[in-house]
């Protein structure tokens, strides 16, 4: 039954993606559900592709992306953060994420780009992308 649910969710996502203009909100909500999460989705402004806010379990996305691939990579990346926060608990996730950023900065690296949690989320997104494209 689990596979049937995933397949029907997959078909719905693919149908949405094939529309002339992708409904990012609906597609993101469907993806979040496929990973067993209840994270909220909202649109924001700014230069970031996306952001996960663990305190409110919210994924913030841009209103548009250069390609469907960029959109999917962003949503999947943020889903990984949400999965980690769910697995560890919000407070523990925030603590570990912040510590990793501090350690990167201490080593003269970027606290965001060189944060091991960001690297894990990017690997997860690349690994999962083929399921949705």
Predicted regions and their residues:
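An active-site-proximal "capping" alpha-helix that borders the catalytic cofactor pocket
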Residues: 116-129
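Short secondary-structure boundary/capping segments within folded domains
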Residues: 33, 50-51, 101-106
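Intrinsically disordered, compositionally biased, charge-dense segments
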Residues: 1-41, 91
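Charged phosphate-binding loop/patch that engages nucleotide di/tri-phosphates or the phosphate backbone
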Residues: 20, 127, 131-133
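Short active-site segment of divalent metal-dependent hydrolases/proteases
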Residues: 76-84
């Amino acid at each position: 039954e689990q596979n049937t649910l995933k397949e029907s969710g997959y078909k719905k996502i693919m149908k949405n993606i094939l529309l002339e203009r992708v409904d990012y909100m609906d597609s993101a909500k469907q993806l979040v559900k496929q990973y067993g999460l209840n994270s909220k989705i909202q649109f924001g402004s700014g230069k970031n592709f996306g952001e996960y806010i663990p305190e409110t379990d919210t994924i913030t996305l841009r209103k548009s992306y250069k390609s469907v691939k960029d959109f999917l990579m962003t949503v999947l990346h943020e889903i990984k953060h949400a999965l980690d926060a769910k697995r560890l608990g919000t407070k523990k996730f925030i603590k570990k994420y912040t510590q990793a950023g501090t350690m990167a900065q201490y080593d003269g690296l970027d606290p965001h780009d060189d944060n091991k949690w960001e690297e894990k989320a990017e690997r997860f997104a690349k690994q999962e992308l083929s399921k949705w494209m």
